[in-house]
Amino acid sequence: MSLRLFTDHCVPNSVTQELRDAGHDVFVLKEHIPPESDDAVVIAKAQELNAVLVSLNGDFADIATYPPSQYKGIIALQIRNRPEVFPLLMRRLTNYLMAHSEMPSYEGRLFLVEAHRIRIHK
C-alpha cells in the first residue's frame, strides 16, 4: 500500500522523486498552490488532498500551532542547519515509510525525523 504525501516548497525535488520511486503518491505544493502560501494554507491543502504533509519548515513541528490530532499527519524533517545529515535523515525516513505504509499509521501524529531517530507525537 502506498501513502499519500504532500511535499511543501522546502522539500528538494530529489526527495519528492525518491518518495515517488518508493511507490508513494506524492503531491507537490507548487503544483497546487503558490510556493509563498502561508503555512495555514499549506497544511489545509494537505488536508484537502487527504495527504500527510512532508516539510523542512520547522513551524510545522510546533504542536501548539499545529496540534497533530487535527491533521492527516505531519512529517517534519529536522535538518537544523546541518545539511550533511540529510542523507542519513532521508534513509531513516524512507526505511520508516517502507515499514509503515498505511495512512492510519500517520493520522493525528507528528513525526520529527532526525538523522538518528524519529520522534512521534500524538
What spans do the regions from the language model cover?
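Mid-chain, well-packed structural core segment of small domains
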Residues: 61-93
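Short secondary-structure boundary segments
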Residues: 9, 56-59, 79
